Amino acid sequence: MVYCFLKRNILTSILYTNCVNNERFKIQIYHHFSTMAAVLKHWREAATLLVVAKTSKLIPNGVNGGGLQLAGTGSEQSQYNYKMLMLKRSTKSKFMPNVYVFPGGIAEDADFSAEWLDLYKKFGESESKELLKYLTSAGAGPPMFSRTRDQEFQHIPSELAFRICAIRETFEESGVLIARSIEDKSHLNSDYPRKPVWGTSVPMETQVSDEWRKRVDKNPLEFIKMCRTLNVIPDVWSLSEWTNWLTPVTLSSTGKGARRRYDTAFFMCVVDHLPEAMHDNNETVHLKWIAPDTLLSEYSHSKGLLAPPQVYEVHRLLHFQLVEDLHRFNWDRALNHRVRQYFPVVVGCEDGIVVVYPGDELYPEEPDRIGESPILTVKCSLEDLPKRYPSMNRMVVAGHHWVNTSAGDGQVIPDFEWTFPESLQPKL
């Protein structure tokens, strides 16, 4: 493979919208920027949660007048028996404004607090030991899980801390609290973790929920206090790893959010009902429960913006019409494979550029994660690229994805060949 170099002066926003993975890492780029648990020199660590809720067959999609998404309202029918929780970011957001995303956010020192270990031990010694054993049973994960942290943040494994972060942020942004009573040990018997664990959500009075959401948003340590007060514990048992995305290096230092980068763990939690949820009117301004096919139909017809990782990941979900199949697949996959870090790399061609992901034969062995090297280029036209480099996991500038190979982490290949069912076609 012959690479030449192209100056970093094209396409100021394409990398803002895409990400890719890699298996080999240069340790020297992970120096700390401060003593905070999840802050590095070039990016911050974060967690997000795919909350997948089982519905009855062919439940229509819709939103009621108050902004609370409920089953049984609307007209469009889905081929899927589940919906995902999606939140629209505020136009004032410094990162990806006005875009629909999964709930989530930046990890805080409180997520790594030793108080959590005490709380989980209170839940049960044997359950805690099995949990900690399960979290790393598939081996070492990508850097955000496996790197060594400052001693004050080593009380609990990163795998546990980022799950707590995902649950905390989901509660702050949507009011959905994935937790279980301190007395509830159901589904955590000798079969755990061989069988998928369904998530549990804690119902709360709106006034109580709103008060705690505000308190936790102002001070993440309040999340621990809330759990103690309500006698609940974050249901980390039901969260399985889904993927890991690192925001790419932008080609311009200008623009809203251009310098903001995040190494984000994506988790999945499957629940057997649609929990009541409401956006926070701060970071998020709209909320909806929506099936994957309906979401992509809306996106393709310009009815809403999606963050690029969401576009890629939701296309994976298209393989699973039944939530039971999705749950079993990802649970078994997570038992045997750790996620890989998806970090997008731009490759220049003679007449354009593509963004390549892990598994693509154009993906470099040592990608430049901090933007010190010129953009890689290949002497080939876009038209000839699939012929010369047929193992593809890439995106063309126009937004089209060419994917026929996996990243080697046990995940399914996104179904970009999917077409809209007749019931979801736009009405002319």
Annotate the PLM regions.
Residues 2-428:
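N-terminal leader/linker segments that precede catalytic domains of diphosphate-processing enzymes
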